[in-house]
């Protein structure tokens, strides 16, 4: 497993602190949609990395 970039960790941690109830423990697709709604990130790759990081941290 690769080490996540700093911006993925920082953004993921901020989102988990502010919107804890918006994310699911095991559902990557739900977390991906939540990241899309809560941020203005346009890059699909970055959005998926952040959603994957949040899913990993919630488990």
Swiss-Prot record:
Species of provenance: Halobacterium salinarum (strain ATCC 700922 / JCM 11081 / NRC-1)
GO biological process, one term: translation
Similarity comment text for this entry: Belongs to the eukaryotic ribosomal protein eS17 family.
Gene3D superfamilies (UniProt xref): Ribosomal protein S17e-like
GO MF term list: structural constituent of ribosome
Full protein name: Small ribosomal subunit protein eS17
Pfam families given in the database record: Ribosomal_S17e (PF00833)
Signal sequence coordinates: none
